[in-house]
Amino acid sequence: IIDGQWDQNYSYAEKKDLLMKLKKTLELKEFNGDLIHFVDVLLQNVEVLHRKDTVGSLLRDQYMAENVSWILQKVQQRGNDCIFISRHNEHIAKWGSYDSMWKLLSNQYRYYVIGTNFYKTRCNLPEGNHKRTIQTFYSHDLLAKTTKLASFKMCWIDFSSLEEGTEIKRHADAYTYMGTLGESYSIMNRSLPPSYRMFQPPTTLYDNMIYVSNASPTKIIE
């Protein structure tokens, strides 16, 4: 794996075969079950990247939900009953048009969701061939813009504390654009801004949100 991407010299079948052999070797040598699970996660990654259809997206959320449950079980064995996880907004949102990670987990666990959004962001994104590009995006989110105009670098809003009838409550309940950037860059992001935005009411998706006025790109340390 190079910069988080599989070496393209290996085919799907070769990657899967290599990992299956590694898993079998670990099982025969009776290695720690955690290590075997990590190999299973790599197998999941190979499978998801191989599937380019809608089934692949659904499979990804299914695997994420399974892995979160696995992590929680490990934490519970150590005497704790809560975990804090970080995921893309669409995977943790309380509502979605497909079986997202949250939808799957919400059938088993209580779940408190913190969303994030930006007014302006510069992102360091992979664009294929192990190259990266820094691109600028705007969410067009009114609450994020308010954070910027109020001169806040960051702002946290607990939606449960908003009073009915107030302007901020109306904006939080209303449909608005929110940034939803993924882990890669496409020319479509530049020519078709809705490709990196979703149009939903913030209070429908999250229990509260963190707004960032100007987000800076991640610095990759070689």
Regions found by a protein language model. Give the residues of each.
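Structured catalytic-domain cores with a bias toward divalent-metal coordination
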Residues: I1-E222
